[in-house]
Amino acid sequence: DSQLNKIYTERVKSYRNRINALQAVQSGDVEPTIDPTASPEEQRATLANHQKNNFENMIMKERPDVRWTDVIGVDDAKNALRESIVYPTKRSDLFPLGWPRGILLYGPPGCGKTVLAAATANELDGYFINVDGSTMMSKWLGEAEKNVAKLFKMARSYADRESKPVILFIDELDSLLGERTNEIGGEVRSRNQFLTELDGINGKGKDTKLYVIGATNKPWSLDHPFLRRFQKRIYVSLPTLESREKLFTLYTNKLKLDGRVRSHTLA
């Protein structure tokens, strides 16, 4: 399906950009455009722009054309996302006590957590920023805590500039916020920065349309201070027999199948 494939195509593109960045580090060609004869101010500006481009290449900002109807099964998760994000955003006057800004999607891999987040952004006609935790922690793309700060700053700018909802989806959340037996200074600072940013959007009285949706296959590995910041936790379960049958029907309806093929048997 072309609509769903767009998500994975963009993710492959982000990984290719990351590989290019790593190869540039190994070859010593990290700053190819800096003119050694330029003034220190010009060199710093060039380097800052280069780092900004590296950072933005790792992030998917274009919203995929994915609707709720494209997400088969997981009805409980869809209803929970509607109640947690969609309804409060559209009718905030009905939620005077506030609503969660941090949502954790957890469950087995390959069950549609990314697609659910993208469909939520489409339902709200908002922005969808997709980044994986391992990219944020990459030592080759600058200091991790600065990446976290830049990520939230960019998301807030989108929300404030056009007053549109922004879904900040962080995949592989455990690689960024998981429990550590030994931590180096950069990891500690990045995790503290993430805590600060989450507290900023979760504060009472905040009228922000920025939502952080984290996804993980290992929720037990997350540190408790971070887990508390995700006020809503939604389990994305394995598809049932009925859901698997609908999936086969959806993805084979454009194929020419042998008359003996039955979706129920495949499911």
Where do the model's predicted regions map?
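Walker A/P-loop NTP-binding motif of AAA+ ATPase domains
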Residues: 58-266
